[in-house]
Amino acid sequence: MFSFFKNRKDSNMKLIVGLGNLGREYVNTRHNAGFYVVEKLAYELGEDITERKYKGLFAKARIGNEKAILLEPQTYMNNSGESVRAFMDYFKIEAKDVIVVYDDINLEPGNLRIRLKGSAGGHNGIKSLIAHMGTSDFPRVKMGVGEKPARMDLADHVLGHFNAEDKKKLDEAASHAIEAIKLMVDGQYDTAMNKYNVKKTK
């Protein structure tokens, strides 16, 4: 394994962040879709997200020819920016080299959407990132988890678990998200968006 800590300043280093909540009760909930994708990516790369630093669990990896850090902030969703900012500062990573994966209620399960910048769209984890990073100009991969049913509280919806059908759709979308992340790490943002920003029918 290459050394990250001998030379923290590396213009090619990427920070891939999955957003979610820590705790067994949140595993496989809609709000933890970001954790799910990053953990699946780590598994594919033969890495474990087990190292601790700056309020986060992380793994060091290589994606293609690029160095990358896979990060799961352990601050709970609403304070995710604290951990991300600390990693950016320590490793001298710019916002454009941070790729954030998170849940989006405006997309149906099975869909994903890649954006290079944008508002928080009501997502508290992204609000925290924007506040601590000082910019909204960072790439993100949004994972569809579906709109909340009528008369259901939003928190209950996003903290709820996927049913079997939607979990299957998430698995497929997660595989596509991983391929998209690989393209993005390689600088092929347009290719990733053209290939994966396709709406799937229910």
Name each model feature, range by range.
Residues G122-G125:
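Hydrophobic alpha-helical segments within soluble ligand-binding/sensing domains
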Residues F2-K117, K127, A131, T135-V141, ...:
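Nucleotide and nucleotide-moiety/phosphate-recognizing core
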